[in-house]
């Protein structure tokens, strides 16, 4: 994911510096909270299961109200049934954690002209490519990656309706935020961004429980142990039937970020390439309101 985006970013910066010289270019960092919504967590506002996200970005303004952003986010997502308020889901006793890397490209529309007004709300939307790999911890505290265990017998000839899922997918990011231009060169902001994915396996949970004996022969004892973990809470809890609901495939998983952003404009910053000077941005931009004169009588 990162290699692909870096190639295109470097290509744009070094092949087209003259085309960008009259436009405003910001670079920055971001950090905040990451969340997930899916079969293990239906509530998008659960702060107790939030995790961290950090990122870097570049933002180009071809027009005062319109900008194009590209960047990378590095996050962690996760959830556990033990925090669920529903008794039947707590009894399921599943959990997962996943590191998530994302590269994205979005289009942002500001409500106000950033060259005239220091503070402006905005909305954005775009496309992203992300990689994840869910894991959990067994009863001995050992970290176990779930994809290779095929906990729902993905890929088994006995379950053709359960195909293996991919660890690299695309999503549709969208959301909004607010930006405050502290000076001509520095901006800070807050953003809430949702990611609509097209997979139901961020949490490794999607459909029904596979037959216990079939799963044992296909994937081994460790897969059986981590497919159903209710017996860890109640030793007399039986393994569910092959028609038992483990997840809901009708609803895809989501992830989203709530971040604070810090940006620096490259206006007035020049560098040499092949003996020529290049620069980015409008060095004469001023972030000030128009003066309003008092009426005369």
Could you tell me what each predicted segment is?
Residues 128-253:
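Outer-membrane beta-barrel transmembrane domain signature
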Residues 39-45, 88-96, 158-164, 245-248:
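Extracellular loop and loop/strand-boundary signature of outer-membrane beta-barrel proteins
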Residues 21-24, 65, 113-120, 183-185, ...:
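Short loop/turn motifs that connect adjacent beta-strands in outer-membrane beta-barrel proteins
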Residues 29-31, 56-60, 105-109, 125-127, ...:
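Residues on the lipid-exposed face of transmembrane beta-strands in outer-membrane beta-barrel proteins
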Residues 36-42, 78-83, 131-137, 187, ...:
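Outer-membrane beta-barrel proteins
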Residues 65-148:
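Gram-negative (and chloroplast) outer-membrane scaffold detector with strong preference
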Residues 22-61, 254-270, 297:
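Short glycine/proline- and aromatic-enriched beta-strand/turn motifs that initiate or cap beta-hairpins
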